[in-house]
């Protein structure tokens, strides 16, 4: 089977919602406990589009989304405007097929193309597979916060990793850039 990574379109939102809701219900990849409806995903899609941020999907030969990736603002303050936090989710039937790393690699290139300087990953501390993938793609661990989250009745540690997208670049000199 071959895979293609492309920009998401509204027709992908049902598959994105299904993948997201599975992560909510069955994994520690996201610490939300409530599933979302299609309207929620549409609002999320529209907000990403309005900000000029990508949503990528990896699709099979039938053009069905098997995973998705996106990034958004790290924090809502001007001083962080060159730093983004990403998310990557893969359909449960497709995990272990290296789709996540492919999506993340494509997303990194998009962030570079957008002129971003740092990409942040916030990963559940016990997710060794995700931490390993991030290390393979050049991320370094920048911190660990013990017991800052809770899901499925357990305290969760948060590992922060970051990737310098354009090391050595000088900061923009114009105000507001």
Where are these regions (language model features)?
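Helix-loop element at the rim of GNAT/NAT acetyltransferase active sites that forms part
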Residues: 18-35, 48
